[in-house]
Regions:
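Short coil-to-beta transition motif at edge beta-strands of beta-rich domains
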Residues: 38-54, 161-167
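Short beta-strand and beta-hairpin "edge-sheet" elements
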Residues: 170-215
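Short, acidic/charged, Gly/Pro-enriched secondary-structure junctions
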Residues: 152-182
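Short structured motifs
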Residues: 125-129, 188-189
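Well-ordered beta-strand positions in beta-sheet-rich domains
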Residues: 48, 60-62, 70, 178-184, ...
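Oligomerization/assembly interface segments of phage tail-like spikes and tubes
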Residues: 129-150, 197-212
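Short acidic, glycine-rich loop/turn motifs
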Residues: 15-17, 51-55, 170-176
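Small/polar beta-strand repeat architecture
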Residues: 2-10, 17-32, 38-41, 54-126
């Protein structure tokens, strides 16, 4: 089987700009698949939705499938260790609104998440024993041509100064699916220019929770 590769050109990157009006959630299943039921939700396959009023299940999740009022979340969304909510009185679902594609990007660099290390050495240990600790989420560095007067780059500055946590989405080429997550601008837009060149800029988005991959 030939090696599969994923070209950079043709990738799409979006930032969340808001949410649709929240719709009432009337049911949730936690196993075998994570699903929610909401009449008139308006979500479609590939959307990123925000759940509120569901306690430990609150958060942003990609949509894998839609059947009438039933929304099935991505396979990576694992709720099997959670309890279904006892009440849906305040439960809502809203769909993320996206910016236009950030076409000025020339490089995307994602730092992987890392696991901390816990020392579990005891007096019976023959040496130092460790186990996996807490996850520290990585970051995404975007490098792009500097144009602070454009709507996209103005929004980056706004998000930084507002200390906003926002959704992001990257759609890959060659049927490799999409990545979804949330984060905040850790480093505001920098800039660099020189003679016979063009200004370049970049930002660092610190991930606030795990990301999710939704296959094509």
């Amino acid at each position: 089987m030939p090696t599969q590769t994923t070209p950079f050109q043709g990738t799409k990157f979006y930032l969340g700009t808001g949410l649709t009006e929240g719709k009432t959630v009337t049911a949730v299943t936690v196993k075998p698949n994570a699903t929610i039921t909401s009449a008139g939700h308006g979500a479609k396959v590939g959307d990123f939705i925000k759940l509120t009023g569901l306690g430990a299940l609150d958060g942003y999740y990609p949509v894998k499938a839609v059947t009438n009022d039933l929304i099935t979340l991505a396979d990576e969304v694992d709720w099997t260790s959670q309890d279904a909510p006892a009440s849906y009185a305040a439960a809502k679902v809203a769909t993320v609104k996206w910016s236009s594609n950030f076409c000025a990007i020339k490089q995307i660099e994602g730092d992987g998440d890392t696991l901390g290390e816990e020392d579990i050495t005891t007096m019976c240990s023959e040496g130092t024993e460790t186990e996996a600790g807490e996850i520290e989420y990585g970051s995404i560095k975007l490098t792009f041509f500097y144009a602070p007067g454009t709507a996209m780059q103005a929004d980056l500055r706004k998000k930084f100064h507002a200390k906003e946590t926002f959704p992001w989405m990257m759609i890959l080429k060659n049927s490799q699916g999409s990545l979804y997550g949330t984060g905040f601008i850790q480093t505001s837009p920098n800039f660099s220019g020189e003679v016979k060149g063009k200004f370049e800029s970049g930002v660092t988005i610190k991930k606030t929770k795990r990301d999710y991959h939704l296959p094509a």
